[in-house]
Curated annotation (Swiss-Prot):
GO terms for cellular component: cell projection; cytoplasm. The keyword Chaperone does not apply. It comes from Lachancea thermotolerans (strain ATCC 56472 / CBS 6340 / NRRL Y-8284) (Yeast). Its main location: cytoplasm. Belongs to the TDA2 family. It comes from the Eukaryota. It is found in: Cytoplasm; Cell projection. This is Topoisomerase I damage affected protein 2. Keywords: Cell projection, Cytoplasm.
Length: 114
């Protein structure tokens, strides 16, 4: 798979768990759930995030990007998420994980303080 860059810096100063833990939760859930079942992977991430912080509500979005290496093409994916929220307490985080099948999962976690 070609090089991929994802900005994985939390967008607020207060986040539910350390960025490294967020990445670990996403990677573990992606590895444990079938890459064909995005719903199960999303649910797994939500369960782990809820265990990690009871002070936040969470939204998780997963996008699966898969293509054949034998084809010659350009792939461009742009995504933006925003919210009307408290910028010091609420935020978002994006992370990319390569699956065993060679696909790429792009995960976005959004949190809002309760």
């Amino acid at each position: 798979m070609p090089a991929l860059e994802v900005n994985s810096v939390p967008s607020s100063s207060e986040f539910p768990v350390a960025p490294e833990k967020l990445a670990s939760i996403i990677e573990t859930s992606a590895r444990d759930a079938s890459s064909d079942d995005l719903g199960a992977c999303t649910e797994s991430i939500l369960v782990e995030l809820s265990k990690a912080s009871s002070a936040h509500k969470f939204v998780v979005s997963l996008t699966k990007v898969a293509f054949s290496d034998s084809e010659d093409f350009n792939l461009s994916i742009d995504s933006s998420i925003g919210g009307s929220w408290n910028k010091t307490k609420d935020g978002g985080y994006s992370h990319s994980v390569e699956t065993e099948a060679g696909a790429r999962l792009l995960a976005t976690v959004v949190w809002v303080s309760k």
